Amino acid sequence: VTQAVLLGLVQPALCQHLMAHGLPVVGMNAMGQPVAYGEYLDQAVYGEVGKVTAINQDYIQNQLQNGIGVCAPIAISKSGQTLNVNGDVAAAAISRLLEAEKLYLVTDVPGVMVNRHVLNKLTPQKADQLLETQVIKAGMKPKIKAAFDALKHGVKEVEITNELQHSGTNLSVEQFAI
């Protein structure tokens, strides 16, 4: 069911949204060509939930020549099972493995919010403080963790935003030494 919703509704809607802004977009979840491979987190506890362990780099690189890649957060296990993976964690893993320079984490809010204002920039120290005091919670937590994971592993910049025309919260290796 999750796979049908992600591939049949969510991914096409996101692609349409990006194309409406004049961006070249390619959906990258062909059943014959998986984007990501993964393994179960703990099948007894989480069911069909996993983490990305490898990517189909040749396929992805080929598709990216045609536009901005949009892929659903699913991975294929060694046994061929479809695994649900956290979208932010998957995006960070894929960007890291592709040695991408920039990662956009698109969300339903304009960026990391503090007192109803968007933070333009976020350092690890500030993020730790906001996480500790539970200013950052719920769905933003995995985004922050994924963003810093991507930065620690070679991605130079991450933007957390809901808009394509306006900046959200920017995290970059230039703001701090990792």
Feature annotation, model-predicted:
Residues 1-178:
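C-terminal catalytic "cap/lid" subdomain
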